[in-house]
């Protein structure tokens, strides 16, 4: 699982989802990528499941880049606990994604293989995504 080595504070507030992605909106490293169409949280388990799905489909061909990192802690209170008594303990880590964010990039494979691999990975996520290819920027 991906998680930060250390953070300044153990617990975080929920934050806002408004707006579009501020960065990582273009395919910069590979030839093809997976871009988000919705906003939401992507957990470290979902990122790992996507990585495994892509690598299993490509069978050591090509190269994969993960463009998101789960740096936000999500807390959870124990089961059957009454309300109040403070915020729960950190439970898992998520990456906040907004529309336009590139999640994964793939290189050195055919378009069909990249599309199939990223489609399998997209099935592991709880948000809508689309397949994009690299465009030359000036």
Swiss-Prot record:
SUPFAM superfamilies: Ribosomal protein L16p/L10e (SSF54686). One of its GO terms (molecular function) is rRNA binding. One of its GO terms (biological process) is translation. Keywords: Ribonucleoprotein, Ribosomal protein, RNA-binding, rRNA-binding, tRNA-binding. Pfam families: Ribosomal_L16. Gene3D superfamilies: Ribosomal protein L10e/L16 (3.90.1170.10). The keyword RNA-binding applies. InterPro entries: Ribosomal_uL16, Ribosomal_uL16_bact-type, Ribosomal_uL16_CS, Ribosomal_uL16_dom, Ribosomal_uL16_sf. GO terms for cellular component: cytosolic large ribosomal subunit. Binds 23S rRNA and is also seen to make contacts with the A and possibly P site tRNAs. Part of the 50S ribosomal subunit. Belongs to the universal ribosomal protein uL16 family. This is Large ribosomal subunit protein uL16. The gene is rplP.
């Amino acid at each position: 699982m991906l998680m930060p080595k250390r953070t300044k504070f153990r617990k975080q507030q929920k934050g806002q989802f408004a707006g579009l992605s501020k960065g990582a909106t273009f395919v910069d490293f590979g030839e093809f990528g997976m871009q988000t169409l919705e906003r939401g949280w992507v957990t470290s388990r979902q990122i790992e499941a996507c990585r495994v799905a892509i690598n299993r489909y490509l069978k050591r061909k090509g190269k994969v880049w993960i463009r998101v990192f789960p740096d936000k802690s999500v807390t959870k209170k124990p089961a059957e606990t009454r309300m109040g008594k403070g915020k729960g303990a950190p439970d898992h880590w998520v990456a906040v994604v907004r529309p336009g964010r590139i999640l994964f990039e793939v290189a050195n494979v055919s378009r069909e293989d990249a599309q199939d691999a990223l489609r399998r990975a997209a099935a592991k996520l709880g948000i809508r995504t689309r397949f994009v290819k690299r465009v030359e920027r000036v």
